[in-house]
Amino acid sequence: MIAKEAALHEQLAWWANALGITGSPFDSFLTLRGLRTLDARLRVHQENTAALVELLDGHAAVRALHWPGRAAHPGHLIAARQQSGFGAMLSVEIEGGEAGVRAFLDGLRCFTLAESLGGVESLVAHPATMTHAAMSPEARAAAGIGDGLLRFSVGIEHADDLRADIAAALDRVVALQGQPKRSSR
């Protein structure tokens, strides 16, 4: 750590030690290296997410779809005005409650069930049993976190692989409901 004044250096060093906020030189190298491809990675994240939204929107197995890139999203206009893209996070409410969610998750191969979101790999989380499991069902419902809610962090894998994975998982939910399959777009 470098500071112009010794007192500032001492104070910053104390906070860095207390909070563990300093990275190693190798961490700094990796950060700088990763910044070079950040724009390209974010572009692929968003393109993949838009492709999945197209597949999910209006599907019989989907009760609701939440992504600010959809014109129907309540935050769409402000997101369009303030952002250069709509991101790679989306939430879906699956039909069929817990059984529908289990069928969907069991059908995924490209997405990993995880609470960590935002990496280059595609991840999915079930908030009712993961991040918000300690909340009562009533508190979750009041917060809009139903048993059918899934949160996705879409990665940079090939879009066709992700679409096929989601389509197969949706087919499992539709089969559970006893409805005919909807063809993928």
Language model feature labels by segment:
Residues 41, 106, 122-185:
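PLP-dependent enzyme catalytic core of the Aspartate aminotransferase-like
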Residues 1-89, 93-123:
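Active-site C-terminal subdomain of aminotransferase-like
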